[in-house]
Amino acid sequence: MADIIDIANPTRTQAILNQYGLHAKKKFGQNFLTDLNVLHGIVDVAGITSEDYVIEIGPGIGALTEQLARSAKKVVAFEIDPHMVAVLAETLLPYDNVKVIENDILKVNLAHVIATEFGEGAHVKIVANLPYYITTPILMQLLRAKISWDNIVVMMQREVADRLNAEIGTKAYGVLTLTIQYYAQAQLAIKVPASAFNPSPNVDSAVVMLTPIVPETVVDNPDKLFSVVKGSFAHRRKSLWNNMLQMFGKQEDVKQRIQDALDSVNIASSIRAERLSLNQLTALYEALKLQGLIK
């Protein structure tokens, strides 16, 4: 395939866009990556080999997909824009190990897709150049999906990348930080300049690699744990107590059970959630369960 001009080549990217009368759509957060060094870096960071099954999110016109296909055993790419799906049918024609699925990744049962495309219980690597406006919901879904993944390598807005490893008490510290801490270790792998894209975004970007970890404290139902975490941060400037009342109600018996739960884990009701560690919030979750506030 040495004679194939890379899709990411700026001239070819523009030719493809012109051929199909396409332009980057703001509603899908589209920016086309045209820097081969960055693309090769993403593949290298993910450690893609000929034995790997890869899920890609948001292939666009196929610049990253092409690089993945050259290294992976099989790539399944999810694209929400039907116009891009039509383009991909042509740009990825040389690669018989790629399948493009037109769907919103937030509506996909990944476990089912993986079982169907790769085999029951298959391990996958997930690679994505995510639309910045929807990065957090997609990351949350990937982390909480009941699938086996070796790593997740994601291009995202630098500001979001900074939130992944934010320190307690900082403005960046929140639900996303805590979710990452429970499921994964985050590493900022590549800093990406705006000039790497067509059109250039107004923000800096970064490639982050997530690797799975065993949680320090495993809970019976992570979804319920993070429902409590989310509720605790619902109003960042309010105390944990006020957010708890909003979650569970203001009846006197409920207030007493909330207070008993807080006392049992030595958390002051006046504290804000941004001052609490994952271990503290996990302990609070267990205490709230013992009080019958979480079924």
UniProtKB/Swiss-Prot annotation:
Subcellular location: Cytoplasm
InterPro entries tied to this protein: KsgA/Erm (IPR001737), rRNA_Ade_diMease-like_C (IPR023165), rRNA_Ade_Mease_Trfase_CS (IPR020596), rRNA_Ade_methylase_Trfase_N (IPR020598), rRNA_adenine_dimethylase (IPR011530), SAM-dependent_MTases_sf (IPR029063)
Keyword line: Cytoplasm, Methyltransferase, RNA-binding, rRNA processing, S-adenosyl-L-methionine, Transferase
Nuclease is among the record's keywords: no
Gene Ontology molecular functions: 16S rRNA (adenine(1518)-N(6)/adenine(1519)-N(6))-dimethyltransferase activity; RNA binding
Pfam families xref list: RrnaAD
UniProt keyword rRNA processing, yes or no: yes
PROSITE patterns in the cross-refs: RRNA_A_DIMETH, SAM_RNA_A_N6_MT
Top enzyme class: transferase
Binding site residues for S-adenosyl-L-methionine: 31, 33, 58, 79, 104, 129
Reaction(s) catalysed by this chain's protein: adenosine(1518)/adenosine(1519) in 16S rRNA + 4 S-adenosyl-L-methionine = N(6)-dimethyladenosine(1518)/N(6)-dimethyladenosine(1519) in 16S rRNA + 4 S-adenosyl-L-homocysteine + 4 H(+)
Domain of life (superkingdom): Bacteria
This enzyme's EC code(s): 2.1.1.182
Location (main, coarse): cytoplasm
Any single Gene Ontology cellular-component annotation: cytosol
Function in brief: Specifically dimethylates two adjacent adenosines (A1518 and A1519) in the loop of a conserved hairpin near the 3'-end of 16S rRNA in the 30S particle. May play a critical role in biogenesis of 30S subunits.
Annotated family: Belongs to the class I-like SAM-binding methyltransferase superfamily. rRNA adenine N(6)-methyltransferase family. RsmA subfamily.
Full protein name: Ribosomal RNA small subunit methyltransferase A
